[in-house]
């Protein structure tokens, strides 16, 4: 999750110019097509959207536009912790489950949580350690009173990890001092007995078990003042705000309640199917994660997708480093040729048997604008699709095109076109369906698990085999040592004789 400053090459027109950019990321911690009718077949639908329960949908004026951040550095919400309240900016992360805040001085923090100043802090006398792919943090667990000023008007007692040491976790200039993990208890650290913040919120206040995110990053101009270069968005706690999206909400089941795991059944580049076994798209999982910047794909899928994107955008040549996220490409301000880049379509399992829907992602999402480059006369971008060793991650650049509903009560995630997404006059982001898709359950990757009783049986058998081999070996060793002792006595005597000579 930490930034790694690098010297990057900027591609301008037909030449290459050196420039300094910022290689930013938020964290740290995928075979033939499906059988069945063609996915292009649209089915009739009686209604665009099923009715919502009272209180789950409506206007949440006080929560609209309560997120801030910077492109590539995450979205944060203002929270207060302790008594008297200490105000902190907290990164919104649907890919983890710990509520953790900086609790010691750090070069990248302007402020931090001071437990000794809170009369309501309770020490749990337990430590916690969280490693990421790049970076880590460790701290001490406790509980305190927490509220969200631009959220529901409630205060809850929640578990807090006070970060005392970290490495490559906090981001210089990001303006956030902690992380709010909104996923499930199964992936909480140190173990699943630690109740996550959102679980505590629902349990103590009876707020509906649902939240929704509108991330508007790409819609904010860059290469201007720091204030204007900020990104924004909304986190709606307890329901759905219909003013934040257009069209219909389409839902995909949450496959397993740990990360927000979903099932991708098909991937297209400009309408062309990658024609891979759908298990490859979900190897070893597919998750929706606001705490990761990029769309991350398993190795085979990434290679196939990049090959197709290269072919579709072949009217211009880009350095290999661009496709690896190591170099930027630049055009004169206002002349970015969006039309040469293809759209990416992800088909997600629907709620109805044998039906799926697709979300269409624009190049304005997967080409991430980068600020702080050598010249402000150019618009520069980083390729925000990258390779993953831990499955597909639908990160912030994907979510920025959509209003995403995390309906935990009904174990599903909804997608609709965001009212703030960036597009041109020719194409817009889209959520469409339904499509006929058979055997979608087969697309989910099942991590091999061995029954515990089987493991115990294997352990006993191995122990018995070891004992059978070790017994004669021990006897042989004992016999050898006895013989050696006898020889040793004779050898000592012989040596004495030699010395006497």
From Swiss-Prot:
GO biological process entries: amyloid precursor protein catabolic process; amyloid-beta formation; amyloid-beta metabolic process; cellular response to amyloid-beta; cellular response to copper ion; cellular response to manganese ion; detection of mechanical stimulus involved in sensory perception of pain; membrane protein ectodomain proteolysis
Side of membrane Cytoplasmic, spans: 479-501
Signal peptide: 1-21
PROSITE patterns: ASP_PROTEASE, PEPTIDASE_A1
Disulfide bonds, paired cysteine numbers: 216-420, 278-443, 330-380
Residue ranges of every copy of the Peptidase A1 domain listed in the record: 75-416
Organism: Rattus norvegicus
Lipid-binding residues (covalent, S-palmitoyl cysteine): 474, 478, 482, 485
Modified sites of kind N6-acetyllysine: 126, 275, 279, 285, 299-300, 307
Proregion span(s): 22-45
Motif DXXLL: positions: 496-500
Catalytic residues as annotated in Swiss-Prot or TrEMBL: 93, 289
Transmembrane regions listed in the UniProt entry: 458-478
Protein name: Beta-secretase 1
Record note on domains: DXXLL motif is required for a proper endocytosis and retrograde transport to the trans-Golgi network, as well as for regulation of lysosomal degradation.
Lineage: superkingdom: Eukaryota
Similarity-based family: Belongs to the peptidase A1 family.
């Amino acid at each position: 999750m930490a930034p790694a400053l690098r010297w990057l090459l900027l591609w301008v027109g037909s030449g290459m110019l050196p420039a300094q950019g910022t290689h930013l990321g938020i964290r740290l911690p995928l075979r033939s097509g499906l059988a069945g009718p063609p996915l292009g077949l649209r089915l009739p639908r009686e209604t665009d959207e099923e009715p919502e329960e009272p209180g789950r949908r409506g206007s949440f004026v006080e929560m609209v536009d309560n997120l801030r951040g910077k492109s590539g550095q995450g979205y944060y919400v203002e929270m207060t912790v302790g008594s008297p309240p200490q105000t902190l900016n907290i990164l919104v992360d649907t890919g983890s489950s710990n509520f953790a805040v900086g609790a010691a001085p750090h070069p990248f923090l302007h402020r931090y949580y001071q437990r000794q100043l809170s009369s309501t802090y309770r020490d749990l006398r337990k430590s916690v350690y969280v490693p990421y792919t790049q970076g880590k943090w460790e701290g001490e667990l406790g509980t305190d009173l927490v509220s969200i000023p631009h959220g529901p008007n409630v205060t809850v007692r929640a578990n807090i990890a006070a970060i005392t040491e970290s490495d490559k976790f906090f981001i210089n200039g990001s303006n956030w001092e902690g992380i709010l993990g909104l996923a499930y208890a199964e992936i909480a650290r140190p173990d699943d007995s630690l109740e996550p913040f959102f679980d505590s919120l629902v349990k103590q206040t009876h707020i509906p078990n649902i939240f929704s995110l509108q991330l508007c990053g790409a819609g904010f101009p860059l290469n201007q003042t720091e204030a204007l270069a900020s990104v924004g968005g909304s986190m709606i706690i307890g329901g759905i705000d219909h003013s934040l999206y257009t069209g219909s909400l389409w839902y995909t089941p949450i496959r397993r309640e740990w990360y927000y795991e979903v099932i991708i059944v098909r991937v297209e580049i400009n309408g062309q199917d990658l024609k891979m076994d759908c298990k490859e798209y979900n190897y070893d999982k597919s998750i929706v994660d606001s705490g990761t910047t990029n769309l991350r794909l398993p190795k085979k899928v990434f290679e196939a997708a990049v090959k197709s994107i290269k072919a579709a955008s072949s009217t211009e040549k880009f350095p290999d480093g661009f496709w690896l996220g190591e170099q930027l490409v630049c055009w004169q301000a206002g002349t970015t040729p969006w039309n040469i880049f293809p759209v990416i379509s992800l088909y997600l399992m629907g709620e109805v048997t044998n039906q799926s829907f697709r979300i269409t992602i624009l190049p304005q999402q997967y080409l991430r604008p980068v600020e702080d480059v050598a010249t402000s006369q150019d618009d520069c971008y980083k390729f925000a699709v990258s390779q993953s060793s831990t499955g597909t991650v639908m990160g912030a650049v994907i979510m920025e095109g959509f209003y995403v509903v995390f309906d935990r009560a009904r174990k599903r995630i909804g997608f609709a076109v965001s009212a703030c997404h960036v597009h041109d006059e020719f194409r817009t982001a889209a959520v469409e369906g339904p499509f006929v898709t058979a055997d979608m359950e087969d697309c989910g990757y099942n991590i091999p698990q061995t029954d515990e009783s089987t493991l115990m049986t294997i352990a006993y058998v191995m122990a018995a085999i070891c004992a059978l081999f070790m017994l004669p070996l021990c006897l042989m060793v004992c016999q050898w040592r006895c013989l050696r002792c006898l020889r040793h006595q004779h050898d000592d005597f012989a040596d004495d004789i030699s010395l006497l000579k």
